[in-house]
Amino acid sequence: MNTVKTVRELRAAVARARSEGKRIGFVPTMGNLHSGHAALVAKAAQRVDFVVASIFVNPLQFGAGEDLDKYPRTLAADQEKLLEAGCHLLFAPTVEEMYPDGMAGQTRVSVPQLSEGLCGASRPGHFEGVATVVSKLFNMVQPDLAVFGQKDYQQLAVIRALVHDLNMPIQIIGEPTVRAADGLALSSRNGYLSEEQRAIAPVLYRSLSQIAQAIRNGERDYPKLVAEQQQQLEAAGLRRDYLEIRQAQNLRPATAQDRELVILVAAYLGATRLIDNLHLDLDTPA
């Protein structure tokens, strides 16, 4: 695996791979990688001949008071994990390489509606930052396909819409969330949790699972289900940001008639914000 830090080097390496007839896969990350990221790279490696990953902590998607400065930078360890997972090329640019003219006047990409509500409500500007940097990276790499984790469900929906609306010839693959044995979704931010908090955190997935089971059992009073689980989260010591049941395809509020749902949660455990979701297809057996 080679590591490059400039757009020029990146494009040259991808051009060489294309000249050899290779299909290109892409996995963008912010680094501090775990088994979930490795699964994304492995999925890409199954589908294409040449896998590119990026590591870039994107300032545009962090708001005031968020964890931009303390977000872990672990490049050496990340390189080892990428190599083991089947990555061929790592793009690890600086902020200056990505935004050579600064960020104040940077052209922005916005995906309305899907970016509103849920994480978009509590993190204003976040998805604009995501859509902008992903658009830049897609233009730099020009992959045949890109793989994203389903843990960031709203982000995945935003990126699917971005690719569709801007006519980008890129296949977007959503890879199922990788979980610890106790159900907690793997996340780079789990490292912020104390031992006591880590023991509490799996309640997020338990709440999602209990809602899903109740719906499968015929319960359609969604506000009641949400209220019950909100109480469970608060009793466990979490501060809820949101807990909602939405239509899986468009993230609109779910009705009793909808058959494909996604249950989404975001909550604070101490100062750490955790997110998770559970997809539910009522036409498919559990």
Curated annotation (Swiss-Prot):
GO terms for cellular component: cytosol. It is an enzyme of class 6 (ligase). InterPro entries: Pantoate_ligase, Pantoate_ligase_C, Rossmann-like_a/b/a_fold. The lineage of its organism: Bacteria, Pseudomonadati, Pseudomonadota, Gammaproteobacteria, Pseudomonadales. Catalyzes the condensation of pantoate with beta-alanine in an ATP-dependent reaction via a pantoyl-adenylate intermediate. Gene3D superfamilies: HUPs (3.40.50.620), Pantoate-beta-alanine ligase, C-terminal domain (3.30.1300.10). ATP binds at residues 30-37, 149-152, 178, 186-189. Pathway: Cofactor biosynthesis; (R)-pantothenate biosynthesis; (R)-pantothenate from (R)-pantoate and beta-alanine: step 1/1. It comes from the Bacteria. (R)-pantoate binds at residues 61, 155. The active site is at residue 37. Homodimer. The keyword Cytoplasm applies. Beta-alanine binds at residue 61. The keyword GTP-binding does not apply. It catalyses: (R)-pantoate + beta-alanine + ATP = (R)-pantothenate + AMP + diphosphate + H(+). It is found in: Cytoplasm. One of its GO terms (molecular function) is pantoate-beta-alanine ligase activity. Keywords: ATP-binding, Cytoplasm, Ligase, Nucleotide-binding, Pantothenate biosynthesis. This is Pantothenate synthetase. GO terms for biological process: pantothenate biosynthetic process. Belongs to the pantothenate synthetase family. The reaction proceeds by a bi uni uni bi ping pong mechanism. It holds the Pfam family Pantoate_ligase. Its main location: cytoplasm. It comes from Pseudomonas fluorescens (strain ATCC BAA-477 / NRRL B-23932 / Pf-5).
